[in-house]
Amino acid sequence: MIITLRGTPGDDSWCTRLRTEVSDDLLALGAPGLAVNVRDATVGDSLMTLTTLDPPVVGLVAIWTQQSYGPHVTGALDRLRGECDRVDAYLVTESVPLPPPATAPGARTPGFANVALLRRPADLDAETWFARWHVDHTPVAIATQSTFGYVQNAVVRPLTSGAPVVDAIVEELFPLAATRDLHVFFGAADDADLGDRMNRMVASTSAFGANRCVDTVPTSRYVMRSPFAAEVSQ
């Protein structure tokens, strides 16, 4: 499941507290996996920021758990509600076409994680939308960008009352310089290459509506507890 945290951006002390004190409290609940993403000063000036929600998303918490309505989830929501203006949770299914690099527990993942909240257009049925997103778009995204980690979360349903409509939450890892340089973001050799890569991406995202009504949140990513033991650095 993924929890979105919404509030006023720019509070680095909040970001630090979320990935330390608050994360310790969440770890104590015993969930098999926990990751925290924060929109901190390291990524705050990113060019890759799009916002439709008010207040905007300033952090996300991912919890791997066997029970979406069990104490791992209810305890986390209770703890997080006092930390920001709005807390919403979504049950998701995770696909990982490009696994992120393993990190030590609590260490910052290299680069930055660009998190996108996607909505399925009303004129696309679910089967077509998933096919265009997963089957058609995935190889284009990997080929045209400098991505070194790619996680796709399809939303099954919201877990909190009144949660904004979100149909997918995508996390892509990029070099940190990509927050300020489109050439780095797209892995382009020159202006002509950049134009070609951008055109291919626009055509691909337009096919499933990811070019509109989307939020993109630049974040620093911290895996506090990996649910996959083989991924944990020794």
Tell me the role of every PLM-derived stretch.
Residues 1-234:
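Macromolecular interaction modules
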